[in-house]
From Swiss-Prot:
PROSITE patterns per the UniProt record, alphabetical: THIOL_PROTEASE_ASN, THIOL_PROTEASE_CYS, THIOL_PROTEASE_HIS
E.C. code: 3.4.22.50
Signal peptide: 1-16
Record-annotated active site: C137, H270, N290
Cysteine disulfide links: C134-C175, C168-C208, C263-C311
Protein name as it appears in the record: Viral cathepsin
Glycosylation sites: N159
Function, in words: Cysteine protease that plays an essential role in host liquefaction to facilitate horizontal transmission of the virus. May participate in the degradation of foreign protein expressed by the baculovirus system.
Propeptide residues per the UniProt entry: 17-113
Keyword vocabulary terms for this entry: Disulfide bond, Glycoprotein, Hydrolase, Protease, Signal, Thiol protease, Zymogen
Keyword Coiled coil: no
GO terms (BP aspect): proteolysis
Entry-linked Pfam families: Inhibitor_I29, Peptidase_C1
Length: 324
């Protein structure tokens, strides 16, 4: 095909897909219909439109500046960044991060390993879940890791009860937030965790109804990792399994697809599950499983560039556990 024709086709496709801020009212009406949104008053609708327009301007700016990722109008488009973070994340940072999980300092240079690794390809990662309007990302990331540990050890899937962890973990704060290593500690203290089918998710704080006779996974030891070298997460991922990590979710809210090169860290506020890494067009990236449903991002997943501390991924909070 003629190179000029090919360029015009590609350029035209990109232009057709691009947003125009002048069309914000049309996009907003489409958004209301698609996501079945309604508001209590016209003044509230106007306020939400103003937030929507601000988010649209950010999306347009990101799509212009980030050549390897795309951003879109999604279900969070009428929420301010602060609203999204307060309602749909849930990592809570106390003054004291110590507990009886063993602390491991990853201060040695990374080993030479494969350029690509993905636990999904080995069929060891359970389906994407949706935490809803409950700050329980910490519970989902922690149990997502245990679900993968179970799959690695027993070669079968099981979905564990985030609701049990929300209701029965008295160190963390349920839908008001928690941490990864303290959640592993809570599972150890409880003696185990039930299946989601026995203790279904309700997306709110409730009374503890744990039944020890129905525990399906028990934790024998937990770890918290201090990462000096970001690349060392590769070794950890391959040897341990999918790893719950802490990030700043502010820049991923309107993510659609691709490798994010720009993801700031203004403060850790969200927990996700690191499941793999790879290289695309010379850009190395991490693969992370989110808990905002399969209709967000790349079927519930997102990718960020490695070795730039994207979203603050290099920190003292990655955690894991061994199961019986």
């Amino acid at each position: 095909m003629n190179k000029i024709v090919l360029y015009l086709l590609v350029y035209g496709a990109v232009q057709c897909a691009a947003y125009d801020v002048l069309k914000a009212p049309n996009y907003f009406e489409d958004f209301l219909h698609k996501f079945n949104k309604s508001y209590s008053s016209e003044s509230e609708k106007l306020r939400r439109f103003q937030i929507f327009r601000h988010n649209l301007e950010e999306i347009i700016n990101k799509n212009h500046n980030d050549s390897t990722a795309q951003y879109e109008i999604n279900k969070f488009a009428d929420l301010s960044k602060d609203e999204t973070i307060s309602k749909y994340t849930g990592l809570s940072l106390p003054l004291q991060t110590q507990n009886f999980c063993e602390v491991v300092v990853l201060d040695r240079p990374p080993d030479k390993g494969p350029l690509e690794f993905d636990w999904r390809r080995l069929n060891k990662v359970t389906s994407v879940k949706n935490q809803g309007m409950c700050g329980a990302c910490w519970a989902f990331a922690t149990l997502g890791s245990l679900e993968s540990q179970f799959a690695i050890k027993h070669n079968q899937f099981i979905n564990l009860s985030e609701q049990q962890l929300i209701d029965c973990d008295f160190v963390d704060a349920g839908c008001d937030g928690g941490l990864l290593h303290t959640a592993f500690e809570a599972v150890m203290n409880m003696g185990g965790i039930q299946a989601e089918s026995d203790y279904p998710y309700e997306a709110n704080n409730g009374d503890c109804r744990a039944n020890a006779a129905k525990f399906v996974v028990k934790v024998k030891k937990c770890y918290r990792y201090i990462t000096v070298f970001e690349e060392k997460l590769k070794d950890l991922l391959r040897s341990v399994g999918p790893i719950p990590v802490a990030i700043d979710a502010s820049d991923i809210v309107n993510y659609k697809r691709g490798i994010m090169k720009y993801c700031a860290n203004h403060g850790l506020n969200h927990a996700v599950l690191l499941v793999g890494y790879a290289v695309e067009n010379g850009v190395p990236f991490w693969i992370l499983k989110n808990t905002w449903g399969a209709d967000w991002g790349e079927q519930g997943y997102f990718r960020v560039q490695q070795n730039i501390n994207a979203c603050g991924i290099q920190n003292e909070l990655p955690s894991s556990a061994e199961i019986y």
